[in-house]
Curated annotation (Swiss-Prot):
It is found in: Secreted. It comes from Pongo pygmaeus (Bornean orangutan). The keyword Magnesium does not apply. Belongs to the beta-defensin family. Keywords: Antibiotic, Antimicrobial, Defensin, Disulfide bond, Secreted, Signal. This is Beta-defensin 132. GO terms for biological process: defense response to Gram-negative bacterium; innate immune response. The keyword Secreted applies. Disulfide bonds join 27-55, 35-49, 39-56.
């Protein structure tokens, strides 16, 4: 029983003394990332925290890129035009 109490006391002491570094320290205060040696799956490195650690940020926190939207069926209409040209060439060759 005394041994169990000694083990529990030692574990409680160690949890207060040893920092929890499994997740890494926070990057700059405005960045929602953590300084790590290797980024986890689903994360990307934005910048270096120091010479050996990267600021890893989850993809869900990154802004979505503004891509231009296609208007209507632009690509399909171009495809139809090329098919018409091919048909015209076939009819002129056979005539």
């Amino acid at each position: 029983m005394k041994f169990l109490l000694l083990v529990l006391a030692a574990l409680r002491f160690l949890t207060q003394v040893i920092p929890a570094s499994a997740g890494g320290s926070k990057c700059v205060s405005n960045t929602p990332g953590y300084c790590r040696t290797y980024c986890h799956q689903g994360e990307t490195a934005l910048f270096m925290c120091n010479a050996s650690r990267k600021c890893c940020v989850s993809y869900s926190f990154l802004p979505k890129p503004d891509l231009p939207q296609l208007i209507g069926n632009h690509w399909q209409s171009r495809r139809r035009n090329t098919q018409r040209k091919d048909k015209k060439q076939q009819t002129t060759v056979t005539s």
